Amino acid sequence: MCYMKSFLYSMAGCILLYTPLDSLGQLNNNKKQSLLSYVDPYIGSSAHGHVFVGASVPFGAVQVGPNNINKGWDWCSGYHYSDSVVKGFSQNHLSGTGIPDLGDILIMPYTGDIRTTTGSQQDPLSGYSSYYNHADEIVSPAYYSLVKSDSVRVELTASERVAFHKYSFPSNKNA
């Protein structure tokens, strides 16, 4: 009987020792997936969503992002997914409100001659506006990037109180 108790205690000890080690191995084999893969930053940026696309953080004082030429109520956030013309990048946007406001401190990096007007949707190149393609956009929380049709790369990021702009110009063009 004594041998039987010893054997059972030994087996129970082995099981208790092996189980936590085995589960640790399983935890290490699980691939970590970023929660950002579940975020679609374009949600609400078309139709009547009025959501801006750009860089911001929760409860941040700045919402830096692109501005399209305003063609009506659907553009009140400054950006509409259906558009292909950007007129600049501003520090503040209202998102999802249904009322146009903010769009403060508009900055537009561009190449070529100095232009002081926005241009039009039909002829954006008559002013400082530029064409762009969504394939050239990178959008994620707190980061926005775009390569405009004049090959100027715009990168925007935001913290709680500060927006940071980085512009990279092609070396073969006047900027």
Describe the function of each predicted region.
Residues 26-175:
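Accessory carbohydrate-recognition regions in carbohydrate-active enzymes
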Residues 1-29:
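Bacterial Sec-dependent N-terminal signal peptides
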